[in-house]
From Swiss-Prot:
Organism: Pyricularia oryzae (strain 70-15 / ATCC MYA-4617 / FGSC 8958)
SUPFAM superfamilies: Lumazine synthase
Residue sites binding 5-amino-6-(D-ribitylamino)uracil per the record: W25, S59, W60, E61, V119, L120, I121, F152
Upper lineage: Eukaryota, Fungi, Dikarya, Ascomycota, Pezizomycotina
Claim: Transferase is one of the keywords in the record: yes
Annotated binding of (2S)-2-hydroxy-3-oxobutyl phosphate, by residue: E124, T125, R166
GO cellular component, one term: riboflavin synthase complex
GO molecular function: 6,7-dimethyl-8-ribityllumazine synthase activity
Catalytic activity of the protein: (2S)-2-hydroxy-3-oxobutyl phosphate + 5-amino-6-(D-ribitylamino)uracil = 6,7-dimethyl-8-(1-D-ribityl)lumazine + phosphate + 2 H2O + H(+)
The protein's name: 6,7-dimethyl-8-ribityllumazine synthase
Assembly and interaction partners: Homopentamer.
Amino acid sequence: MHTKGPTPQQHDGSALRIGIVHARWNETIIEPLLAGTKAKLLACGVKESNIVVQSVPGSWELPIAVQRLYSASQLQTPSSGPSLSAGDLLGSSTTDLTALPTTTASSTGPFDALIAIGVLIKGETMHFEYIADSVSHGLMRVQLDTGVPVIFGVLTVLTDDQAKARAGVIEGSHNHGEDWGLAAVEMGVRRRDWAAGKTE
């Protein structure tokens, strides 16, 4: 049973665009964390098309990847006209131009929140401490520099079992990815409110 953390709040994520960057180190732990995160985003109304997932080799690369992913999203502009995939050109031709798919603002605009997911397990050297400290500070810097919430989904644990418990793969344990999904929706909604001058 999960007894720590804030009481979950209900927020409508249907208008949000969320970016996720995850490390591939400790993949057996990463996979359930990512699944839990995405499941909670979808449960909060975030559209599948508005969830963008990228991976990097390890947690060390998370800050630069999160930063550049957000920068790339700022360069995207919504299309005002028809947008066709290569398959659409032949497979689903139509003379009714109003029936053609279009790219919506929510599926191409800047992200409302970003989630960084990684797993650091302490070994015999100081490598763990250096990486954990640098990644923590790096991700904090990204969110303060961009003004976009970056959810800290990096486990810093002492043993494999601690990691498994926090990924919800041990019976009776809680998947922390669900918490990260909820936090991303809440902070994404708040960011939009702040941008609109809302303080209540």
